Curated annotation (Swiss-Prot):
<dbReference type="Pfam" id="PF00069">
    <property type="entry name" value="Pkinase"/>
</dbReference>
<keyword id="KW-0723">Serine/threonine-protein kinase</keyword>
<dbReference type="GO" id="GO:0048573">
    <property type="term" value="P:photoperiodism, flowering"/>
</dbReference>
<keyword id="KW-0067">ATP-binding</keyword>
<feature type="domain" description="Protein kinase">
    <location>
        <begin position="24"/>
        <end position="281"/>
    </location>
</feature>
<dbReference type="GO" id="GO:0004674">
    <property type="term" value="F:protein serine/threonine kinase activity"/>
</dbReference>
<dbReference type="GO" id="GO:0006468">
    <property type="term" value="P:protein phosphorylation"/>
</dbReference>
<feature type="compositionally biased region" description="Basic and acidic residues">
    <location>
        <begin position="463"/>
        <end position="472"/>
    </location>
</feature>
<comment type="function">
    <text>Regulates flowering time by modulating the photoperiod pathway. Possesses kinase activity in vitro.</text>
</comment>
<dbReference type="GO" id="GO:0005524">
    <property type="term" value="F:ATP binding"/>
</dbReference>
<protein>
    <recommendedName>
        <fullName>Serine/threonine-protein kinase WNK2</fullName>
        <ecNumber>2.7.11.1</ecNumber>
    </recommendedName>
</protein>
<dbReference type="GO" id="GO:0004672">
    <property type="term" value="F:protein kinase activity"/>
</dbReference>
<dbReference type="GO" id="GO:0106310">
    <property type="term" value="F:protein serine kinase activity"/>
</dbReference>
<comment type="similarity">
    <text>Belongs to the protein kinase superfamily. Ser/Thr protein kinase family. WNK subfamily.</text>
</comment>
<keyword id="KW-0418">Kinase</keyword>
<feature type="binding site">
    <location>
        <position position="154"/>
    </location>
    <ligand>
        <name>ATP</name>
    </ligand>
</feature>
<dbReference type="InterPro" id="IPR000719">
    <property type="entry name" value="Prot_kinase_dom"/>
</dbReference>
Length: 568
């Protein structure tokens, strides 16, 4: 009995805890690369296991490009929200241990390559489902504005939860935002790199080529071009248009035709959207229950008989992909029938400072008040609206509409304010199954924290409001104070009753103004660090006002841009 208790106690001991106290890291290593180590960790708030990614900064003293790669991965993961893209939870810089830490979701079955090698007898129906999910993730990346190219798509970078058949794209360290018509850097894994990558002039279709190689890997259990012994041999074959030998071992004509469409010349190559509409990925005949044997790979003689089963109809993308031209996936759906009222009100606090309140109410009487500062010297309506959507996980409003409302209110308060929403990105409609955008319990909010661990008691930007006396809940996410409640009602005698206080005694406008100053201070601190010296072996002491946190995206921006280009 004592042995069992000792085992439980040992397994529950955290070797490290994040600054917020929410995530605890175990000593168990899930994976290890040249610079990054992934540990098993636990989310105490949600009661789920997560992946704790740790990158030692001392590994980059001679290779700052690799450091920027990891900052890029963290920055991109934070801004992405899709069911087929790896979820990002939080990140922080540990200045004492000189490490970057970020927490992502944990995949129970590892990578798709590992999973496929463990389960060799897989029906074509399952392969199709995996393909559809990967393409949906790619479509989301490519439909961003500007598009995002993964640049290193392979089964090693695709993860799966085997108990649900859920597939997600991860490892975005080499991903690039396509700000021009093409990218100009040769990166990736040679076996999965399209011919145009070697010419260093390419677009998002290189991911489609890599996806085709992934399909080939799924059905052949091996890397493409495994017959080559050196990257130079792969380069010669790829640039001369020769397909890998494994392609010719695929006997199923439909599989071969589908892969060939992915590997076609860039001028003829289909997009992720077009591949999703390809007949190969559509459901089989439900009436006939066609179950003919399939022998899709001739190079492995233990696969046995594969049966083609009818697929279940997946209506998720029927409405979303009616148009063949998509600039960016819309973040929210807001139909007229939702009866959602939105209003915004603000007041000036100084020359450049403005304090705003965005109020969202619905037909069921729920009210959401979002308080936030706006500094006209550095903020734009679009950037603040996007930040609000990302931080607060708003799912039922249009980011463009919010940006326009912010612009209009700022213009009313500042006569010489220049409206910026006309040049902002247009957003298309992406139906979202999340219904409310109102939290059920404050304790379970999926907020993102970015803090600096300094060895002392950590402070973070998540403040709980006192909601014990009313039916409301509130929290602070970065610059935003988020308050939920119910609309005022009237009793039988006509007396007005309110389900919540107008403002909590623990939160005031002064605190929001201090929060704005902290945000500005931490930005300047990062610029001073990057101007003064590069990251080195000696820990850097950072003295901040309690409640301050260093934002990884800000640090990433400071690294990526010339210091002189940033206005102090």
């Amino acid at each position: 009995m004592n042995g069992e208790e000792s085992f439980v106690e040992d397994c529950s001991v955290f070797v490290e805890i994040d600054p917020s106290g929410r995530y605890g890291r175990y000593d168990e290593i899930l994976g290890k690369g040249a610079s990054k180590t992934v540990y098993r960790a636990f989310d105490e708030y949600e009661g789920i296991e997560v992946a704790w990614n740790q990158v030692k900064l001392r590994n980059f003293t001679r290779n700052p490009e690799e450091l920027e790669k990891f900052f890029r991965e963290i920055h991109l993961l934070k801004t992405l929200n899709h069911q087929n893209i790896m979820k990002f939870y939080t990140s922080w810089v540990d200045t004492n241990n000189l490490s970057i830490n970020f927490v992502t979701e944990l995949f129970t079955s590892g990578t798709l390559r590992q999973y496929r090698l463990r389960h060799r007898r897989v029906n074509i129906r399952a392969v199709k489902q995996w393909c559809k999910q990967i393409l949906k993730g790619l479509l989301y990346l490519h439909s961003r504005s500007p598009p995002i190219i993964h640049r290193d798509l392979k089964c090693d970078n695709i993860f799966i939860n085997g108990n649900q058949g859920e597939v997600k794209i991860g490892d975005l360290g080499l991903a690039a935002i396509l700000r021009k018509s093409h990218a100009v850097r040769c990166v990736g894994t040679p076996e999965f790199m399209a011919p145009e990558v070697y010419d260093e002039e390419y677009n998002e279709l290189v991911d489609v080529y890599a996806f085709g190689m992934c399909v080939l890997e799924m059905v052949t259990f091996d890397y493409p071009y495994s017959e080559c012994t050196h990257p130079a041999q792969i380069y010669k074959k790829v640039t001369s248009g020769k397909k890998p030998e494994a392609f010719y071992l695929v006997k199923d004509p439909e599989v071969r035709e589908f892969v060939e469409k992915c590997l076609a010349n860039v001028t003829c190559r289909l997009t992720a959207l077009e591949l999703l509409q390809d007949p190969f990925l559509q459901d089989d005949n439900m009436d006939g229950f066609v179950m003919r044997p399939i022998d899709y790979y001739n190079g492995y003689d233990e696969t046995g008989v594969f049966l083609r089963h009818p697929l279940i109809d997946d209506p998720l993308y029927h409405d979303q992909f009616e148009s063949s031209q998509i600039c960016e996936i819309d973040l929210f759906a807001n139909d007229d029938e939702d009866h959602v009222d939105i209003s915004i009100k603000g007041k000036r606090n100084g020359d450049d400072g403005i304090f705003l309140r965005l109020r969202i109410s619905d037909a069921e009487g729920r009210i959401r008040n979002i308080y936030f500062p706006f500094e006209t010297a550095i903020d734009t309506a679009w950037s603040v609206a996007v930040e609000m959507v990302s931080e607060l996980d708003i799912t039922n409003q249009d980011v463009a509409k919010i940006a326009e409302m912010i612009d209009a209110e700022i213009a009313a308060l500042v006569p010489d304010w220049k409206n910026d929403t006309e040049s902002s990105q247009n957003v298309n409609n992406n139906k979202n199954n999340n219904t409310a955008g109102f939290c059920g319990e404050c304790a379970s909010n999926g907020y993102i924290q970015e803090t600096v661990s300094s060895g002392e008691k950590s402070h973070h930007n998540h403040h709980e409001f006192d909601s014990s006396e009313d039916k409301s809940c509130s929290s602070v996410h970065g610059r935003f104070a988020d308050m939920w409640g119910l609309r005022e009602s009237y009793s039988d005698d006509g007396e007005k009753q309110s389900s919540r206080k107008v403002r909590s005694g623990r939160w005031s406008e002064n605190e929001m103004r201090r929060e704005l100053r902290w945000l500005k201070a931490r930005h300047k601190i990062q610029l001073m660090k990057m101007r003064g010296q590069t990251i080195c072996e000696t820990p850097i002491e950072i003295s901040l006002t309690p409640g301050t946190s260093v934002s990884l995206p800000l640090l990433y921006r400071a690294i990526s841009l010339p210091v002189d280009a940033v206005d102090m």
